[in-house]
Regions:
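N-terminal glycine-rich phosphate-binding loop and ensuing alpha1 helix
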Residues: 1-62, 75, 82, 116-120
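A secondary-structure boundary/capping signal
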Residues: 8, 106-107, 183
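Short glycine/proline-enriched turns and hinge-like loops at secondary-structure junctions
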Residues: 17-19, 144-146, 173-174
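Conserved hydrophobic/aromatic positions in well-ordered beta-strands
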Residues: 25, 149-152, 180
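Alpha-helical scaffold segments in soluble metabolic enzymes
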Residues: 36, 40, 93, 185-189
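Conserved beta-loop-beta/alpha segment of the NTase-like Rossmann-fold superfamily
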Residues: 62-63, 67-155
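Catalytic-core segments of class I nucleotidyltransferases/pyrophosphorylases
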Residues: 103, 117-120, 124, 154-196
Length: 196
C-alpha cells in the first residue's frame, strides 16, 4: 500500500525572522526540522511512501535541501493556491496529487511515537478501519493549546471537537493534533471539519 505524505511548508515564517525557511532550521549537525518527517519512513522507499511539499515562491532553499532524498522517494513540489489560506489551504492545494491513503505532517512540529511503533503501519491500519484519523498529543496547558490545532478527545479516544488556535475556549480542549490521515474519498469531509 502506498502512503502519500503532504508537508504544508508555504508559511512565510515571519515570527522567527530567519534568513531561510523555518523547515530547515537545524536541530543538530545531521537534521533539520523537516528531516523529522522523512525519518519516520527511513525503513521505506518510493514504492511505499511519496511526498508532496506545498511551498511558496520563497522556498527555493527548501527544495535544494530536500534534494538529498531524491534517490529514495518521489517528492512533488506544489505552490499553495493564493486563493487558499492557512494550512488547510496548503493541503487543499495538493489535492490533485493525493493518493488513496494520505497523511499530513507539519514539518515544524516535532512528533515522537511510542517505542516500537511505526508511523507507516499505524496510519495504513487506521485508514483500513476509518477514513479519517488524528494522531494526537494529550495536553493540559491552555497556553500551549492556544497555539495549536486543539482537540477535545473523549474517554473512548474519539475526537469530538476541533478548533484551530482557540482563544476563548482553550480550557475546553485536552489535546492537539500532530498529524492526520485520510483516505482520498474522505478528504472534503475531513477538511470541512477542520475549517468549521
Amino acid at each position: 500500500m502506498k502512503l502519500t505524505v503532504t508537508l504544508p511548508s508555504a508559511g512565510k515564517g515571519t515570527r522567527l525572522n530567519l534568513p531561510y525557511p523555518k523547515e530547515i532550521l537545524r536541530l543538530d549537525n545531521d537534521n533539520a526540522l523537516i528531516d523529522n518527517c522523512f525519518n519516520f519512513f527511513k525503513d521505506y522507499g518510493r514504492n511505499q511512501v511519496e511526498f508532496i511539499v506545498v511551498i511558496n515562491e520563497d522556498k527555493t532553499d527548501l527544495i535544494k535541501y530536500l534534494a538529498k532524498y531524491k534517490d529514495r522517494y518521489n517528492i512533488s513540489f506544489v505552490f499553495q493556491n493564493p486563493n487558499e489560506k492557512e494550512y488547510t489551504g496548503a493541503i487543499k492545494s495538493a489535492y490533485h496529487l493525493f493518493g488513496e491513503h494520505n497523511l499530513v505532517l507539519l514539518p515544524d512540529t516535532l512528533m515522537r511515537l511510542q517505542p516500537g511503533k511505526d508511523l507507516y503501519t499505524l496510519v495504513t491500519e487506521a485508514l483500513e478501519e476509518t477514513g479519517f484519523s488524528f494522531l494526537v498529543k494529550k495536553e493540559e496547558n491552555k497556553e500551549v493549546l492556544k497555539t495549536k490545532g486543539a482537540l477535545y478527545v473523549n474517554n473512548e479516544g474519539n475526537v469530538v471537537e476541533y478548533e484551530d488556535k482557540p482563544t476563548d475556549r482553550a480550557e475546553y480542549y485536552n489535546a492537539f493534533w500532530c498529524a492526520f490521515a485520510f483516505r482520498r474519498r474522505n478528504f472534503y469531509e475531513c477538511i470541512n471539519f477542520m475549517e468549521k
